């Protein structure tokens, strides 16, 4: 059995283009199967509080994650799952074949609004992003990125985002973690400000050229795992708030942005006290 699993793992770690596309097809089929499951879960939704009153989890989150875990065990037994609603202490996200999942990104939106939430799922092979998905379930829109193949919205190729100045762009950030001076400077420099409250959906607006940047000062690995590959394929910038690479297995303060406003946003964030990492966030 160990030899068999190791053989599967070796084959998947060395995926060629056709094999990666086959894996993508299997994952898309699994994601679309949620269309029959999620309405029933929402109809009987139970909510619990985790770290604070804004940090919620529901049976919807847990069931989606459990079903994907079962899918991996059945079809890709050598793959590991690194996910929000489980203990990840024994998972080495940087080696082998690892899926990173946020079963519901924007749980508070699901609970309070029944919209503006998504599923984030990404596949890393030996620490390299290979496949990425953001499923905007309420709008039945599946965004995906395939390494070296591009990014797609419901299988239609997404164009790379043109470089634009900060003055032309809407910025997305949580005002509760920025001091008043920083907020004022960002608002003065940008065209406007918005916040959806789901990291995946706020990031999608950047990917589609609707926002200039999305800033999150407390991102977990599952909040941002898909964004790495989307940023690569769409010619965007994704760094920490010191303009350095992000450790995908750790997370932390991050920005995904249009190349034309990346440095301008970071300059403002790092002046006058800037952001405060440890404040409770209402997102």
Functional labels for PLM-detected ranges:
Residues 1-104, 281-283:
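N-terminal subdomain of lithium-sensitive/metallo-dependent phosphomonoesterases centered on the IMPase/IPPase/PAP
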Residues 161-283:
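An extended, acidic
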